[in-house]
Amino acid sequence: MNSESAEILEVPLAGGNMAGAVVKVGDTVRRPVGPQTPTVHRLLAHLRAQGVDWVPRVHGIDSKGREILDYIEGEVAHGEPPYLRKLETLTTIARRLREWHDATATFERKTDDVWWWPGKEPAEVICHVDFAPYNHVYRDGVFVGAIDFDVCYPGPRLWDLAYTAYRYVPLVPHSEDDVPDGPVFDLSVVAERTEYSLPERLARLDTFLAAYAGEDAALLYPASALLGWAVPRLVAMADWSDAQESAAVRDNGRMYRAHSEWIAAGGLGPAQQIDVVDLRV
């Protein structure tokens, strides 16, 4: 095989549940585009200009109409690899999300921007919306990058924080809790239950929130606030799942709804009541 044929060899990659088929070509990734692609590309360029070097560079559109991004070498954290629940991983993820939020706070919003969803009030930052293990790349157990930016949109910091905490703390019932949350469609990417005790989960949540805030006391959110935001965040996931054709995905939606109700009922302690308002277009 010569260098030219090696360069055009397309290697299918796992994932692509939102964007469709994803392939690796050389040291790049090729992905289908959508109406939001130009806005997302502008966002990624802004992030890198702000020093967020763990998001891929954009290299334009190929001859097949697909976007061209850097390929980030490593493994995507599907399932429960040993490093996923380390405290070091938890704090790293919180700090990376803080970097993302701070950088996107200065992103220039334009009237012709297109997002997957108009957004949520208050539109403090551009939320990744799916900042979760299955969209994170690790190398030797260390976070090295994030992928999949198709569903980004403006929103509150806590909208993002709630879902990331749900996945990484995790904010899910104990394996022995009586919560009607099954079955789910893909246990390799859904940590639907945990063996952490309630005190352990709350301690991990406090660690996550402290790492996100750093030295900024104004961003040290109380656990009750994050838990409050987790309720509508999971309801949004459930609503999206309910609208899908796949019965398996709708099963997954039942899990999100059951977990939202469990958190709202105090499964992890007091949760503030949050009324979420969509941005108007």
Where are these regions (language model features)?
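Actinobacteria-biased recognition of intrinsically disordered, low-complexity terminal regions
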Residues: M1-M18, A265-V281
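ATP-binding pocket architecture of kinase catalytic cores
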Residues: L9-H128, A132, Y138-V142
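Soluble or luminal CAZymes and related metallo-dependent hydrolases
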Residues: T39, T89-T92, E200-R204, M255
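Amphipathic alpha-helical interface surfaces
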Residues: I93-R96, R139, R157-D160, R201-F208
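Catalytic activation segment of kinase domains across protein kinase-like and atypical kinase folds
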Residues: W116, V125, A132-S175
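Active-site activation/catalytic loop segments of kinase-like enzymes and analogous catalytic loops
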Residues: L161-G214, V231-A243
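Eukaryotic Ser/Thr/Pro-rich intrinsically disordered, low-complexity regulatory regions
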Residues: L219-A223
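ATP/Mg2+ or Mg2+-diphosphate-binding catalytic cores
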Residues: R233-V281
